[in-house]
């Protein structure tokens, strides 16, 4: 019987709709800008070469990524008519040695990056892009897993409004679930503990030099419910097999 080499690669990718943070007028002070939106974001790891979002087809992967959009299209807030809002970064905390980065539309590398522990104001980015008040194709990335706490504020480049109150968003650069594997005769047995509200594909590759990963059809679109998922894959005729788990929303 031939020896069979099987190796696990665990990777994560998100293809979901994204959240928004509104930039508008503060309801308690009509002369001040305000930020309204989620305080928590999940940043899943996107392997190199894997798709992340239809809005970022050029994204190369290799980072924990989150597609959070700042917009002047308001619902919870009143619009800040006549303003040209820009988002400043007030502070960044997170894993030691980690970087928090912003990707502008069309970027193939970070537009700017700040190390964790950043203590002061940074210019950030304009909310409107070429007149588009709802700019798609931007992303935030983190290069190490862990919890990042980023504080933002909105300022008006035309000085018609005072800067907003600071808003802190927690980004969880989530490690993928561990994939356990064992050999049972001519089959590889794999299992992992899924996460609720996330989905999974098990992919296989027989030659890493090719860079070609293929979904195992019977183990695709697995719905996570916080339970243990058990899978098998026949390895007959394949002396070398590599597996990776793709997690997405």
Identify the residue ranges that each predicted region occupies:
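Sec-dependent N-terminal signal peptides
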Residues: 3-15
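Contiguous segments within soluble domain cores/interaction surfaces
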Residues: 18-137, 153, 158-176
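Short tyrosine-centred short linear motifs in exposed loops/low-complexity segments
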Residues: 136, 144-148, 152, 198, ...
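Hydrophobic residues positioned within well-ordered beta-strands of beta-sheet architectures
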Residues: 138, 150, 167-169, 190, ...
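Short, hydrophobic beta-strand segments
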Residues: 138-143, 233-235
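Short, charge- and proline-biased low-complexity linear segments
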Residues: 149-160, 221-228
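Short, composition-biased motifs enriched in small/polar/acidic residues
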Residues: 176-249
